[in-house]
């Protein structure tokens, strides 16, 4: 019988098979295949990294929350109409502006794992489970934890990633006596075998243990024990692919230089024909094509929006698993799950075809979206450019 430590037995987590998928290629984890982003693809975002590094805890978290749009009632807050307007020469999906606005309102009514234990939430959530408040987390440690959480998340559900992060955090506190929990210095004291044991439930855990320790050593030797602040420096780290790099850059440094395309964004944008599935064989190709037309003002939030929908239509997911990470006084822990489940079923039934999804959102009168947005189209007619979307869509979302 396999020996399970107290850290790896905190929850019963299914071990994911080592499989290679089109939308989550195993090659993203290989350090030999490095991706260099062309300079012309980068969207300028004025962020003074030295200034960010100088921010104390309170000011840093206040700034990064606003910068990433992770504010209360984010999805229920109407967008500035100008954000959704695109040039007349840009082809956009059928009824995109109206549908996107309604999607945001519907998104405000559902709770998904990404909302509790997503890339930027997981360090704070895990720390609170270990008695470390947000006020006690240094910005440098937070940035490290964002990076490590993103590295662990590849081909792994958020709930499983959160448990692996919790294992590391508790080991750093209990065994290494690190009062701050998961710091660079503490992680470097963990040997590879032990780290592999702590993260055994995530996909490719043995490989990730090696990459994490190698990455931490590089951060110590080459980046003054902090996370790199450019896309190509992040892509130079072992096991870090474009999705991980863009997400880390956004969540840790507030730099929006590209869209983070994970399996959910990849599948839904192909399903709805927001991108050409025949030309987008990898998530990075999906990212490039999506960036060609999606208004830049939406690059920050598109991942969180679609990931939330993608997670709740995954039939194999037990959404109740995420509640264990909520503190008892969190109002989200007392949600009416009967109503949530009914809403999830409606979404599952209607999201599989974009024309059907549009009609579903148009019929949801209780969403009260009349004040959400009033966009003047610069296109001649949106319907003419995407008339093919009226046909049945053959792409199906896998579990």
Curated annotation (Swiss-Prot):
It comes from Saccharomyces cerevisiae (strain ATCC 204508 / S288c). It is found in: Nucleus; Mitochondrion. Bifunctional DNA N-glycosylase with associated apurinic/apyrimidinic (AP) lyase function that catalyzes the first step in base excision repair (BER), the primary repair pathway for the repair of oxidative DNA damage. The DNA N-glycosylase activity releases the damaged DNA base from DNA by cleaving the N-glycosidic bond, leaving an AP site. The AP-lyase activity cleaves the phosphodiester bond 3' to the AP site by a beta-elimination. Residues 223-247 form the HhH domain. Monosumoylated. Sumoylation is associated with targeting of NTG1 to nuclei containing oxidative DNA damage. This is Endonuclease III homolog 1. There is a cross-link at residue 194 (Glycyl lysine isopeptide (Lys-Gly) (interchain with G-Cter in SUMO)). InterPro entries: DNA_glycosylase, Endonuclease-III-like_CS2, HhH-GPD_domain, HhH_base_excis_C, HhH_motif, NTH1. GO terms for biological process: base-excision repair; base-excision repair, AP site formation; cellular response to oxidative stress; DNA repair; nucleotide-excision repair; positive regulation of mitochondrial DNA replication.
């Amino acid at each position: 019988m396999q020996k399970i430590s107290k850290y790896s037995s905190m929850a019963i987590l299914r071990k994911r098979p080592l499989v290679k998928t089109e939308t989550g290629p195993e090659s993203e984890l290989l350090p030999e295949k490095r991706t260099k982003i062309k300079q012309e693809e980068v969207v300028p975002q004025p962020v003074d990294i030295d200034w960010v590094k100088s921010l104390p805890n309170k000011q840093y978290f206040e700034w990064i929350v606003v910068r990433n749009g992770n504010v209360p009632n984010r999805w229920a807050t109407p967008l500035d109409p100008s954000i959704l307007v695109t040039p007349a020469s840009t082809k956009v999906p059928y009824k995109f502006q109206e549908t996107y606005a309604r999607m945001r309102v519907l998104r405000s009514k559902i709770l998904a794992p990404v909302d509790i234990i997503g890339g930027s939430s997981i360090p704070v959530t895990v720390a609170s489970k270990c008695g470390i408040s947000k006020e006690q987390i240094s910005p440098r440690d937070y940035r490290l934890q964002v990076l490590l959480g993103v590295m662990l998340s590849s081909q792994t559900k958020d709930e499983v990633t959160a448990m692996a992060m919790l294992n590391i955090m508790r080991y750093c506190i209990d065994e290494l006596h690190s009062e701050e929990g998961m710091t660079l210095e503490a992680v470097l004291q963990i040997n590879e075998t032990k780290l592999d044991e702590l993260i055994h439930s995530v996909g490719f855990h043995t490989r990730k243990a090696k990459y994490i320790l190698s990455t931490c050593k590089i951060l110590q030797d080459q980046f003054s024990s902090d996370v790199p602040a450019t896309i190509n420096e992040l892509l130079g780290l072992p096991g870090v692919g474009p999705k991980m790099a863009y997400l880390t850059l956004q969540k840790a440094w507030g730099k929006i230089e590209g869209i983070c395309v994970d399996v959910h964004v990849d599948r839904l944008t192909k399903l709805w024909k927001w991108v050409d599935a025949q030309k987008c064989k990898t998530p990075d190709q999906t990212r490039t094509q999506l960036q060609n037309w999606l208004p830049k003002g939406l690059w920050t939030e598109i991942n969180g929006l679609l990931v939330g929908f993608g997670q709740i239509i995954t039939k194999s997911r037990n959404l109740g698993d995420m509640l264990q990470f909520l503190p008892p006084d969190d109002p989200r822990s007392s949600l009416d799950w009967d109503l949530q489940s009914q809403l999830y079923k409606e979404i599952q039934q209607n999201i599989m075809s974009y024309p059907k999804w549009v009609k579903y959102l148009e019929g949801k009168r209780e969403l009260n979206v009349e004040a959400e947005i009033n966009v003047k189209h610069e296109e001649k007619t949106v319907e003419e450019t995407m008339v093919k979307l009226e046909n049945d869509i053959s792409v199906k979302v896998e579990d």
